[in-house]
Amino acid sequence: MKKVSIMGVQYKVFFNSNDSRLEYADADGITDSTTKEIHIAQFENCPNSISNLHDYKQKVLYHELIHAFLYESGLDSNSDWARNEEIVDWFALQHKKIDSVFGEID
């Protein structure tokens, strides 16, 4: 378990979680804004899985962190776009490129 600060709010991140909500939601990760917890599923190598599970786990983590940021910013409760999985995925996948441009400007 790791702790991270999301806009000043402490979240606990659980890796290799066997939380039942993951299975119920058919999800590889979940963010619970009520308990301030992020759960990332346990991934196992098998013939049907992707080869680089470490990178995939990072993508799931980034996705869940974006959910937490949107919730803590208040955007999650104001409109549906902040809960839209495609928007969350886009930010999770593009955050390094965005940060790089910000770094060029500073």
Predicted ranges, named:
Residues 95-100:
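Short, basic alpha-helical nucleic acid-contact segments in DNA-binding proteins
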Residues 56-64:
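Short alpha-helical catalytic segment bearing the HExxH-like zincin motif
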Residues 77:
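A glycine-rich, hydrophobic loop/mini-helix early in the fold
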Residues 2-55, 68-72, 80-94:
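Active-site scaffold of zinc-dependent metalloenzymes
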Residues 103-106:
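Long, well-structured alpha-helical subdomains associated
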